């Protein structure tokens, strides 16, 4: 049933909203499993250390994560002037990849057969916090 006026519901929802700086990349053309290899390497690390890790990581997902991490740092510095975040004090509080849609493709095989190829996508999120 009704839980109150719309403005009251919005006010309550905004009170519990996560206010940590973050960045999200939707529909990244990398599978969740491959993205998690890179994300597991930077989880809990300081921002400068995480940038160094993804810069020299040879995986394809690391270039996507590097751009996303730089975006999260810029979001922290520009979108939260009252908190006055500095890059040297930030660390990767949360980072995860959720499953996105899958593109189905056909690969022709011998004797008129066709195999299905699934090109997987993911939604990658990085949340920073201050130490």
Curated annotation (Swiss-Prot):
A Gene Ontology molecular function term of the record = rRNA binding
Q: Which Gene3D superfamilies match?
A: Ribosomal protein L22/L17
GO BP of this protein: translation
Ranges that cross the membrane = none
Q: Which domain of life is it from?
A: Bacteria
Where does the record place Basic residues bias? 1-11
Q: Where is this region: Disordered?
A: 1-20
Q: Which SUPFAM superfamilies match?
A: Ribosomal protein L22 (SSF54843)
Decide whether keyword Transcription is in the record.
no
* Pfam families in UniProt: Ribosomal_L22
**Per its UniProt record, what InterPro entries does this chain match?**
Ribosomal_uL22, Ribosomal_uL22_bac/chlpt-type, Ribosomal_uL22_bac/org-type, Ribosomal_uL22_CS, Ribosomal_uL22_sf
Q: What does the UniProt keyword field contain?
A: Ribonucleoprotein, Ribosomal protein, RNA-binding, rRNA-binding
A GO CC term assigned to this protein in UniProt: cytosolic large ribosomal subunit
The UniProt similarity line reads:
Belongs to the universal ribosomal protein uL22 family.
PANTHER family with a match to the protein in the record: CHLOROPLAST 50S RIBOSOMAL PROTEIN L22-RELATED (PTHR13501), LARGE RIBOSOMAL SUBUNIT PROTEIN UL22M (PTHR13501:SF8)
Record function comment: This protein binds specifically to 23S rRNA; its binding is stimulated by other ribosomal proteins, e.g. L4, L17, and L20. It is important during the early stages of 50S assembly. It makes multiple contacts with different domains of the 23S rRNA in the assembled 50S subunit and ribosome. The globular domain of the protein is located near the polypeptide exit tunnel on the outside of the subunit, while an extended beta-hairpin is found that lines the wall of the exit tunnel in the center of the 70S ribosome.
Protein name per its UniProtKB record = Large ribosomal subunit protein uL22
Record organism: Agathobacter rectalis (strain ATCC 33656 / DSM 3377 / JCM 17463 / KCTC 5835 / VPI 0990)
